[in-house]
């Protein structure tokens, strides 16, 4: 009986760590979305480069946190606990562990520097897109489309 309680306590600690990790990841995702929304709505157009740099840095922090050895091992250990004896029976928690594990595998295929560069590129492209759309100026946005497509192809290759 003592071993069973000990395993439940260990799972409880791991779940608390998972909740803390999810909170840190969510905070960074939330801040990125606020900056993205700000850039698409009311932020000064000439601030796009600084916003892209800040968002790239924040995206890098998110990527490092998501793919750190500590985070990956936490999710793996929780996944093992779900498979090895059903120590976790909350369906939502099981799905969170599964999705976070998938997110980690995908993110781990891409170096942090490339995740940062992707965020910078898409932030800059968004600012150019809004100007180009209003002016019916496809040519000014075309180079961004080419760069975005090339980067997406590269990311797909890394994930294969």
Where are these regions (language model features)?
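A well-structured
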Residues: 2-159
């Amino acid at each position: 009986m003592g071993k069973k309680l000990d395993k439940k306590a260990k799972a409880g600690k791991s779940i608390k760590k998972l909740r803390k990790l999810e909170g840190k990841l969510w905070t960074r995702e939330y801040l990125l979305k606020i900056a993205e929304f700000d850039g698409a709505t009311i932020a000064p157009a000439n601030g796009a480069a600084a916003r892209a740099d800040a968002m790239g840095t924040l995206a890098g922090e998110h990527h490092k946190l998501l793919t750190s050895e500590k985070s990956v091992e936490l999710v793996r250990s929780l996944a093992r606990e779900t498979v090895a004896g059903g120590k976790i029976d909350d369906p939502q928690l099981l799905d969170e562990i599964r999705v976070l594990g998938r997110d980690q595998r995908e993110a781990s295929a891409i170096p942090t520097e490339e995740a940062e560069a992707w965020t910078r590129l898409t932030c800059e492209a968004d600012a150019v897109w809004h100007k180009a759309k209003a002016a019916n100026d496809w040519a000014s946005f075309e180079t961004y489309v080419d760069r975005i497509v090339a980067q997406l192809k590269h990311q797909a290759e890394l994930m294969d």
